[in-house]
Amino acid sequence: MKYYFENDGYCVCCDKNVKFIATNSWYRDNYICSNCKSIPRERALMYLIEKFYPNYNLLDIHESSPCKRGASLKLQNKCPNYIASQYYGESDKIINGYRNENLESQTFKDESFDLVITQDVMEHIFNPQSAFREIARTLKPGGAHIFTVPLINKERTTECWAKLDDNNNIIFLKEEEYHGNPINPKGSPVTFHYGYDIVDLIYKSSGMVTQIFTIDNVDLGIRAEYIDVLISRKI
């Protein structure tokens, strides 16, 4: 079979020499590791975790809304103090092995974690200010929120895409948009189209200082649109 693009390289998610195979021109979701099936943003995130936190396997880590491959699976397998959460609404505290946590109003104690990880989650949060504030609260001093979020608007101002009305119904302010959700077949509504000014939003709401990293390295299978990784540090 002839693919759109393929190359040999090293996958930081499964730690193997592999082929990276793109089945079409939208690399973000379709430039896949032949072994672990990870995609570029997952590899970019794992690369930066290992670069800046080489002792990550010894750290206390919370990941919200993990998937079952790539960086999430590696963290789960290598980190004894890794906790995964999903948000199921008002329900039991543990569901399907996941802790039930609303990122905007968490039940974790203050200063619980060295790292908080989210992958393409923040664009589905209705109140990101509360979520960033809560993430900062649960981080230890010097800890970091390492995350991916599609910076669709780039240099343009962040736009609110959807909100909740007084009855918690979703109101889209722009064209209706959903992304896949592993625990909800309806998908997750897109609530914001972020730009680079997200760093100001994070600082104003949480006091965390944020860097944006853009990696382009086909040898590591890291090439695609909107795969920036953000690291927000609690000073």
Predicted features and spans:
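Conserved N-terminal segment of class I S-adenosyl-L-methionine
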Residues: 1-109, 162, 196, 219-235
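Acidic-residue sensor for enzyme active/binding pockets
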Residues: 63, 123, 134
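Conserved hydrophobic/aromatic "anchor" residues
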Residues: 108, 113, 207-208
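Hydrophobic adenine-recognition pocket in adenosine-nucleotide-binding enzymes
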Residues: 117, 121, 151
